[in-house]
């Protein structure tokens, strides 16, 4: 069967500007959250990625009028109807689990297929389920392909998350906005995307306090009205382009960025010796290799993002000694390692830690196992000698708006082919 591949001829120096898209991890929660509104919602600044289109079509399955035009989405929930969603759309997208919290909040009942997305080892939704149960929901998991969640009444509850989880924090917020009384989430995730979703819900009339701290309080309301809302910029896309610029850029400028959201990466760049100039909503970066070797450990926000440990890896081949990358969030998130070895990389992984030694990469045929692995392989291809061919690029398109066109505009020798 024919498939699209990305091809890169490495060695070009990049320069120019990139406008960073809206945050994928906000958009995939805010779009399901629109079904909680009674009336019209307009979202602006959405990323133009396949996940957004999938979620919009799930809204349409609930008889919601939804019009997606570029980065804008208009939603009218006036004729909303509950419906079962155990279908292939749900399976293709992990963030479809936000439909659970939103539908539970709106209808007190939902039947939904089990979510898919990037295969990153164990990513259970037990904390989500714990939260739903605390609010009064009963869960039927007897089916292997779908889940039924139902509540006679949703009542506020005190919920302590056993582990910090962005998905569970947001999903509980979605389910709790219409619950009677107060819901308190302890050990809540502090990510900017959690704050963004809370701000969106608040713009519709929800009563949420403490988003961005470890304790979030939600006082249930009777109704949420329509709203217009602008999604925050994507800190992971920004971080990926920062890594691209540090690898092979000369005067690359990134616009529409919140510097505070990428502070940990900027600090790591200072350690490496990358030239970084931070302004209000833009960052300028120059390649300044060879770099200093560093240690990186992923942590929950505001620590180093797990989503950036793969994109930063190719930079470490340009360092003057061995670097170590430990992923404490997803210790199995190292499927890119074998692909990098095909390109001549001196890299080994053992129990969640990669040892990365200075290497000269050459073009090869490689396979993107997940979204951020795909970003890593693109950066590796940009600095490699010869042509790199990346297969399974659908993962890359799930999270990066027009990445091939953006890189072409910066001067990269990159193109797509059908094989």
Swiss-Prot record:
This is UDP-N-acetylglucosamine 1-carboxyvinyltransferase 2. It is an enzyme of class 2 (transferase). Its main location: cytoplasm. Pathway: Cell wall biogenesis; peptidoglycan biosynthesis. Its EC number is 2.5.1.7. Gene3D superfamilies: Enolpyruvate transferase domain (3.65.10.10). The active site is at residue 118. Belongs to the EPSP synthase family. MurA subfamily. It is found in: Cytoplasm. It catalyses: phosphoenolpyruvate + UDP-N-acetyl-alpha-D-glucosamine = UDP-N-acetyl-3-O-(1-carboxyvinyl)-alpha-D-glucosamine + phosphate. Keywords: Cell cycle, Cell division, Cell shape, Cell wall biogenesis/degradation, Cytoplasm, Peptidoglycan synthesis, Pyruvate, Transferase. Cell wall formation. Adds enolpyruvyl to UDP-N-acetylglucosamine. Phosphoenolpyruvate binds at residues 24-25. UDP-N-acetyl-alpha-D-glucosamine binds at residues 94, 123-127, 307, 329. CDD domains: UdpNAET. The lineage of its organism: Bacteria, Bacillati, Bacillota, Bacilli, Bacillales. InterPro entries: Enolpyruvate_Tfrase_dom, Enolpyruvate_Tfrase_sf, MurA_subfamily, RNA3'P_cycl/enolpyr_Trfase_a/b, UDP_GlcNAc_COvinyl_MurA. It comes from Staphylococcus aureus (strain MRSA252).
């Amino acid at each position: 069967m024919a498939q699209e591949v990305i091809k890169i001829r490495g060695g070009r120096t990049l320069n120019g500007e990139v406008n960073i898209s809206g945050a994928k991890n906000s958009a995939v929660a805010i779009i399901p959250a629109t079904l909680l509104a009674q009336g019209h919602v307009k979202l602006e600044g959405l990323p133009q990625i396949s996940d957004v289109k999938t979620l919009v079509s799930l809204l349409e399955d609930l008889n919601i009028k939804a019009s997606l035009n570029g980065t804008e989405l208009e939603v009218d929930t006036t004729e909303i109807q509950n419906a079962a969603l155990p279908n292939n759309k749900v399976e293709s997208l992990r963030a479809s689990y936000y439909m659970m919290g939103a539908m539970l909040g709106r209808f007190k009942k939902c039947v939904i297929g089990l979510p898919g997305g990037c295969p990153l080892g164990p990513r259970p939704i037990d904390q989500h389920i714990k939260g739903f149960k605390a609010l009064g929901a009963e869960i039927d998991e007897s089916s292997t392909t779908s889940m039924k969640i139902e509540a006679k009444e949703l009542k506020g509850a005190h919920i302590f998350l056993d582990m910090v989880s962005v998905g569970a924090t947001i999903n509980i917020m979605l389910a709790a906005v219409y619950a009677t009384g107060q819901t308190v989430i302890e050990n809540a995730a502090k990510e900017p995307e959690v704050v963004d979703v809370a701000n969106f819900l608040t713009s519709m009339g929800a009563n949420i306090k403490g988003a961005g701290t470890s304790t979030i309080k939600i006082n249930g309301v009777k109704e949420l009205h329509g709203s217009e809302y602008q999604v925050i910029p994507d800190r992971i896309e920004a971080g990926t382009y920062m890594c691209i610029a540090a690898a092979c850029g000369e005067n690359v400028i990134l616009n529409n960025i919140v510097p505070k959201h990428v502070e940990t990466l900027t600090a790591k760049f200072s350690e490496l010796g990358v030239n970084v100039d931070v302004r209000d909503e833009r960052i300028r970066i120059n390649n300044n290799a060879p770099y200093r070797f560093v240690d990186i450990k992923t942590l929950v926000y505001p620590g180093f993002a797990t989503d950036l440990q793969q994109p930063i890896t190719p930079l470490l081949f340009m360092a003057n000694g061995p670097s170590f990358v430990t992923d404490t969030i997803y210790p199995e998130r190292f499927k890119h390692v074998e692909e990098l070895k095909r390109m001549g990389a001196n890299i080994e992984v053992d129990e969640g830690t990669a040892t990365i030694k200075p290497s000269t990469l050459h073009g090869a045929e490689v396979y993107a196992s997940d979204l951020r692995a795909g970003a890593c392989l693109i950066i590796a291809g940009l600095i490699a000698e010869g042509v790199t061919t990346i297969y399974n690029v659908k993962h890359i398109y799930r999270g990066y708006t027009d990445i091939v066109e953006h890189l072409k505009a910066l001067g990269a020798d990159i193109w797509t082919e059908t094989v």
